[in-house]
Amino acid sequence: MTTTPVEITPRPETGQLVFKPARRGKPPLHLADFDMAGRKEFLRAAGYPAFRASQLSKHYFERFEADPAAMTDLPAGQREELVAKAMPPLLKTVRQLRADEGMTVKSVHRLFDNAMVESVLMRYDKRVTMCISSQAGCGMNCPFCATGQSGLTRNLSAAEIVDQVVQGVRALRDGAVGDPEEAPQRVSNIVFMGMGEALANYKATMGAVHRIIDPSPEGLGISARGLTMSTVGLVPGIRKFTLEKLPITLALSLHAPDDELRDELIPINTRWKVDEALDAARDYYDATGRRVSIEYALIRDINDQGWRADLLGEKLNKRGGGWVHVNPIPLNPTPGSKWTASRPGVEQNFVERLRAHGIPTTVRDTRGSDIDGACGQLATEA
């Protein structure tokens, strides 16, 4: 059997940004690429009755069914071909790693063209959070992030993004996450913090958002308030996202309050500076009423100085109060990285300095770091 060769994405040069990946083939169309009206037209164009769209949507978005034989409301002689047309397989899970006594599961998925993406499912006492990818790789080239250093392979389709969530829901239903004796839970929180800059793949990302939040059978019916959209500071994307006026949390990966350092840590800062990103984030709060999260990976002797905490506090307060929350994140280790997490005492001082400015600050939980499933570690090591 001949295997399609895997295309190796060249490692990006230092500071180089990639907004558009090299042209590749497109994934097969899936009903999750469309809203209900689009699904009806898609099936009609393929020679099937439009009402099949609602039946298929119930199987995918409500029952999370993948077996055509179980779809008994479809004609027996057409089930296989209908499912093949409207619900083609998009993700093949080739590896799973577990941590936190089975409560955290990282899945590595192979796409139709052998591109690889990862998602992470985290089960807590009263919620289930899923971290999903919007791109295979990432073009933002942040030097402390394994995903950024792998380069951008391609954008994901809306359906490839949604299917990560559906596969996570199936895993929960089947008792594959946590204690199988406990009652199954539904995914309640979705964070676009996996591989890729979601706002650089705007159309597919927003299509996925609507499939996630739209009520079933049009979508998964997950509350928009349970979603978080992360960005490194793609200001035009933030501005565009603001106009959607959805009650989704915006998370700005800042990592430095001064342009001199942020130019090195977050290369997109050479295009849109700290103040521009913070202004856009404040405007997002004004438009949506949703408090913005500032993500700040604490890197030993690089960005963890007390004066930087003070500068960050001053810049946030300059834009008013009550609109922002800071999440310091102990830097997660990545292969070949020269940087490490801040010392505990330095981390605590940074937090206390921010709180002294009246900034709500919470050190973020780093689930899955021992399976390379935490922030900045996703790099598809299959």
From Swiss-Prot:
SS bond partners: C131-C375
Swiss-Prot/TrEMBL cofactor(s): [4Fe-4S] cluster
Annotated binding of [4Fe-4S] cluster, by residue: C138, C142, C145
Keyword Iron-sulfur: yes
Assigned EC number: 2.1.1.192
NCBIfam families associated with the record: rRNA_mod_RlmN
Protein name, per record: Probable dual-specificity RNA methyltransferase RlmN
Organism, scientific name: Kocuria rhizophila (strain ATCC 9341 / DSM 348 / NBRC 103217 / DC2201)
